[in-house]
């Protein structure tokens, strides 16, 4: 769902989630949802609750929430090493919510001499997550939320390898088409790796793949009405390249 850049991502978020579920293959059941603080609000939380889908969502750290957390005294320490991680759970109602919900708060700090860091609140880094997973421990909710980061790697590769973040024109429709073509190229590359590449090369990003196979000295020549690419003999992956060529020919 491509939107203008001046529209907040939380606008019509529930409708966006409903469309996403509708596009899933028949019989595919969603058990959990993870989302960052850009997707928030009463309607969005109700969407998952009404469908009995577990969710974890990052919350914006506000002064009101900070005051609520400041009243909490019984933190549970989960990690007690060079970096200390503690957590609490509380029932909290934001001003825009119709009801109170479970909020877990995780705080982290680097260890200093002794245990004096508890005396200085500014040393702690706080994160808040809203959830309906009432029987989960705060640390498990936090770790489960952080597993969403794997999709960020795909977005990063699409940016670095296919420039999906580049806006080429002033036309929304043209830019949408440009983005769709880039996403299609990314998907074709992923399918190409799965069908035509050696197992050791299937984990390569597009940047690594270009470095391994495309940035190679060569010359294009014309002979007998054919265009031929002659690759330098120093290219040490010629046999791998030939096997990929053969697999591509078998597909076409």
Model segments located where?
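Short amphipathic alpha-helical "interface-anchor" segments enriched in bulky aromatics
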Residues: 138-177, 181, 185-193
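Short, conserved catalytic/metal-binding motifs centered on acidic residues
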Residues: 30-40, 55, 129, 151-158, ...
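Acidic, metal-coordinating catalytic cores used for nucleic-acid/nucleotide bond scission
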Residues: 33-41, 61-63, 173
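Short, surface-exposed basic-aromatic patches at helix termini and helix-loop junctions that form
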Residues: 45-54
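A short, flexible helix-boundary coil/loop motif
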Residues: 188-252
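Electropositive, glycine- and tryptophan-enriched low-complexity nucleic-acid-binding patches
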Residues: 1-27
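An anionic, glycine-rich sequence signature occurring as long contiguous blocks
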Residues: 54-160, 218, 247-252
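Glycine-rich, histidine-containing beta strand-loop boundary motifs that form or position
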Residues: 1-2, 35-36, 57-59
